[in-house]
Amino acid sequence: MTFKASVLTLYPEMFPGALGLSLAGRALEAGTWSLEAIQIRDFATDKHRTVDDTPAGGGAGMVMRADVLARAIDHASPPGDTRPRLLMSPRGKPLTQARVRELAAGPGAVILCGRFEGVDQRLIEVRGLEEVSIGDFILSGGEPAALVLLDAVVRLLPGVMGNAVSGEEESFENGLLEHPHYTRPQEFEGREIPQVLTSGNHKKIAAWRREQAEQLTRERRPDLLGAHPLAK
């Protein structure tokens, strides 16, 4: 089954962008996933192709119109489409590796890239949009966030990563940050590769990596400890 991504945006030329390269790009060419970037302005009805208006109650900036966006969503996601409808938004629920895995296991996603001050709340409610955030910071639009989300999802699709074990050992997959990595040369500016990693004792190596992952998580992301069954 091909993972189908439909992105609603004012800047379709931003796609596939970096997703046309490396793992995601090869998977796109192979048909493992598909991408359509839909111009929201095509669903405006006035000669100026207006997609926004002033906020009710006053205030700075502009708000994206519910009627225009609804037509765009209905075009991308007609009745019977089971793909989740996502709105990239700084006030959304933080994107987690668990949610990424859920999306990768599904048929695809319809992604709305917000602009200006945001989207009319009525659209979010009536079209059942899931608001998603990639972090506690503000971007100029939802497009970079959509690229981040899709990159995280596509790499988990079957056959995209050459070594499935590589993905299983990454940060967040087991509730911990990933352990440090080393490779040749053996010595670099006075620092040696930890001896245990060249010992050939796989049990000791696994224990060292787990210990390092736990230590890094305690130092940098203590909020993760206890939140995942494998991190306890």
From Swiss-Prot:
Keywords: Cytoplasm, Methyltransferase, S-adenosyl-L-methionine, Transferase, tRNA processing. It comes from Mesorhizobium japonicum (strain LMG 29417 / CECT 9101 / MAFF 303099). One of its GO terms (molecular function) is tRNA (guanine(37)-N1)-methyltransferase activity. Belongs to the RNA methyltransferase TrmD family. The gene is trmD. Transmembrane segments: none annotated. This is tRNA (guanine-N(1)-)-methyltransferase. PANTHER family: TRNA (GUANINE-N(1)-)-METHYLTRANSFERASE. NCBIfam families: PRK00026.1, trmD. Residues 211-232 are annotated as: Disordered.
